[in-house]
Swiss-Prot record:
Transcription factor, which binds preferentially the consensus sequence 5'-TAAGT[AG]-3' and can behave as a transcriptional repressor. Plays an important role in normal prostate development, regulating proliferation of glandular epithelium and in the formation of ducts in prostate. Acts as a tumor suppressor controlling prostate carcinogenesis, as shown by the ability to inhibit proliferation and invasion activities of PC-3 prostate cancer cells. Residues 1-14 have a biased composition (Basic and acidic residues). It comes from Homo sapiens (Human). The gene is NKX3-1. It is found in: Nucleus. This is Homeobox protein Nkx-3.1. Residues 124-183 bind DNA. PANTHER family: HOMEOBOX PROTEIN NKX, HOMEOBOX PROTEIN NKX-3.1. Keywords: DNA-binding, Homeobox, Nucleus, Repressor, Transcription, Transcription regulation, Tumor suppressor, Ubl conjugation.
Amino acid sequence: MLRVPEPRPGEAKAEGAAPPTPSKPLTSFLIQDILRDGAQRQGGRTSSQRQRDPEPEPEPEPEGGRSRAGAQNDQLSTGPRAAPEEAETLAETEPERHLGSYLLDSENTSGALPRLPQTPKQPQKRSRAAFSHTQVIELERKFSHQKYLSAPERAHLAKNLKLTETQVKIWFQNRRYKTKRKQLSSELGDLEKHSSLPALKEEAFSRASLVSVYNSYPYYPYLYCVGSWSPAFW
């Protein structure tokens, strides 16, 4: 009789532990699943390619080459950012440059142009205060009783007439000056009226002065004696 070989204990365990063979996965024909499967496959290929082909280590460059490369990288990195900053600085400095050139041109041309004669400034005339009829009557009435006002009286009068103290003070000063001038003119008129001396013209006055001088020093013709001579007529 044929003997069936008995399985060994290790082999039996291995055969018993082997998982069942998985069935073939079902493929979906939806567009989303097809695109997703293609992207996953492409990503898996690239990752496996990277793992197989490691990137070569960069060779050490000399200091000069490194500085040049760094400068080029800085220029490339700061190029688009520096462009608007340079445009802003140019826009800010452009008016200042034009202003400086304009000032220089004006200084150069100012010496060539003839200077116009400067007209002397006329002194500004002080505006006169316009008094109303009622204010003038009250001021005249106060002036007829009192020619000079104290500070409290002037303030009280200015408050009643709705004027400033300076206006009241100036009005009284002008009124006193006008009164004195009238008095002087009237006194001179009285002197001319009551004067007894006749009014002489300039020629008459000169003739009268000569006659008075001649009469004050009379002249008597006679001969003086010379030696033993005696006057002939006396």
